[in-house]
Every structure is written in structure tokens, then in C-alpha cells.
Amino acid sequence: MTNFEKRVFEAVKLIPKGKVTTYGAIACFLGLPKGARAVGNALHKNPTPIIIPCHRVVNAKGMLAKAFVFGGEGVQESFLLADGIPVNNGIVNLTEHGWYFENLKQTKD
């Protein structure tokens, strides 16, 4: 596991139950504003999805991941529903359920 992947996983652990964040928000939090795709790639290597809740990460429009690594979009939706996050046609309302690392210090290597 790379240092970057470890940092992504630690960031994802910060997302509270009942909230989601975006790949881009994680990348910005880690100091890589153009690193959304790298965040997604790291999440595909999540060794412990129960501990590292990657189902709480959606795209910038609130859309679920069609290639959600732990069973596809339907599984991600069921995990989000279990967290109390409604999903409408594969989209989470980011205005209501978005969480963006406000008031947290950026992590460093």
C-alpha cells in the first residue's frame, strides 16, 4: 500500500455516517486538487471496506460509482441507505448530505 493510498483511506474514515463526500473533495483535502481520479483508483484497493467506508464517496454531481468495487452501484446504494442517506435514481443530494472536510487541517505526508 502506498503512502498516498494510506492518506486517502484515513481521509475516508473521517466522513461521518449520514454524509458523503466527493473524490475531488478528498483530493483537495490531501493537497492534490486535480487528483480525483487518483483517489478513485486508491479506493479500488480498499483492504477493509467495513472500516474504511468508501461507499460514502460519490462523484462531483452526487452520482454513485457505476464500478463500485464491492458489488456495483446497487451495493453502494444499499450501504448508503443503511447509513440513512437517501438515493434518488443513483444520485445523492449533496446539498443535504455533502460533507467537505471543513474546519479540518489538511493532512501531510
Each predicted region: which residue ranges?
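Nucleic acid-binding interface residues in structured DNA/RNA-binding domains
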Residues: 1-109
